[in-house]
């Protein structure tokens, strides 16, 4: 869980967080 950082991480590291935060 990231909270508000998940949004920034998803935009910055879409390739890295794509596997962890694929809730979007």
From Swiss-Prot:
Q: Which GO terms describe its biological process?
A: photosynthesis
Does Nucleotide-binding show up as a keyword for this record? Answer: no
What are the UniProt keywords, alphabetically?
Chloroplast, Membrane, Photosynthesis, Photosystem I, Plastid, Thylakoid, Transmembrane
Q: How does it sit in the membrane?
A: Single-pass membrane protein
Protein's name according to its UniProt entry? Photosystem I reaction center subunit VI, chloroplastic
Matching InterPro entries: PSI_PsaH
Compartments reported by the entry: Plastid, Chloroplast thylakoid membrane
Q: Name one Pfam family in it.
A: PSI_PsaH
**Source taxonomy lineage?**
Eukaryota, Viridiplantae, Streptophyta, Embryophyta, Tracheophyta
Instruction: Give the family per the record.
Output: Belongs to the psaH family.
What functional role does this protein have?
A: Possible role could be the docking of the LHC I antenna complex to the core complex.
What GO terms fall under cellular component here?
chloroplast thylakoid membrane; photosystem I reaction center
Principal localization reads plastid
């Amino acid at each position: 869980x990231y909270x508000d950082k998940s949004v920034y991480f998803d935009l910055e590291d879409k390739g890295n967080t794509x596997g962890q935060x694929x809730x979007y």
